[in-house]
Design a protein with these regions (language model features):
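Conserved G1/Walker A P-loop phosphate-binding module
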Residues: 2-64, 78-79, 86-87
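A structural signal for isolated positions on well-ordered beta-strands in alpha/beta enzyme cores
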Residues: 23, 139-140, 169
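Residue-level signature of catalytic and energy-coupling elements of molecular machines
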Residues: 35, 91, 172
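Conserved NTP-handling cores and scaffolds of large molecular machines
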Residues: 39, 43-46, 135, 190, ...
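Switch II of P-loop NTPase G domains
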Residues: 70-76, 82-113, 117-130
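Conserved residues in the N-terminal Rossmann fold of short-chain dehydrogenase/reductase
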Residues: 89, 142, 170
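Conserved C-terminal guanine-recognition region of P-loop GTPase G domains, centered on the G4
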Residues: 115-165
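Canonical P-loop GTPase G-domain recognition
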Residues: 146-198
Length: 198
């Protein structure tokens, strides 16, 4: 289920690419870094640091086996639509202490993909609230973990308090096709919300 290195050039040649900034958001330990690493056609950039006991009082350590955490941002790039559109994927940190930076993260973004985990659905509310405060449209990707409880779509939508028009897909952040499908759901939503004028 892993990804393989791409032959895409690290630098884009000068051309008429449409460049689109997309946020990949979610609470701590949800799979944001994994998804960006999976999708990126270039070596993705990650600002991860080893977690320490000193941070335990600052960050809620909801994921017992997690050893590192994003301390600034993740970045990846994906070219789609036969090279006409370049997606810049920005993974936001999931900890509360980064809340003051959200307006900066959102500046220039077209939309957001919010990753959630059915083991910790309530952890996603703050992130969805932050996205809504920025005015960005978003889609929800339910990242499947082996021990995650399974819910039908209607139950999940109720538990997440999603509006009818907000797309929700099941995905595996480790799988390229599955992660790309989540981005496609977001892209279709953004086109619909813009009245087809993207």
């Amino acid at each position: 289920m892993g990804s393989s290195p791409s032959s895409a050039p690290v630098y884009l040649p000068d051309s008429n690419h449409e460049r689109v900034k997309i946020l990949v958001a979610g609470p701590f330990g949800i799979g944001k870094t994994t998804m960006i690493r999976t999708l990126s056609e270039i070596p993705s950039l990650h600002t991860e640091e080893v977690m320490t006991d000193a941070a335990a009082h600052v960050d809620e350590l909801a994921v017992a086996d997690k050893k590192t955490t994003t301390v600034a941002i993740d970045f990846g790039r994906l070219t789609i639509a036969q090279g006409r559109i370049v997606l810049y994927l920005f993974g936001t940190p999931g900890q509360r202490r980064f809340k003051p930076l959200w307006s900066d993260y959102a500046r220039g973004a077209l939309g957001a993909l919010v990753i959630v985990d059915t083991r910790r659905l309530a952890d996603s509310f703050e992130v969805m609230d932050l996205i809504e405060e920025t005015g960005l449209d978003y889609a929800v990707a339910v990242n499947q973990f082996p021990e995650s409880p399974a819910y039908d779509e209607e139950t999940l939508r109720v538990k997440l308090d999603l509006e009818d028009h907000t797309p929700m897909v099941i995905c595996d952040a480790r799988d390229w096709d599955s992660s790309l499908n989540a981005l496609r759901a977001l892209a279709a939503h953004l086109v619909t919300r813009a009245g087809g004028n993207l």
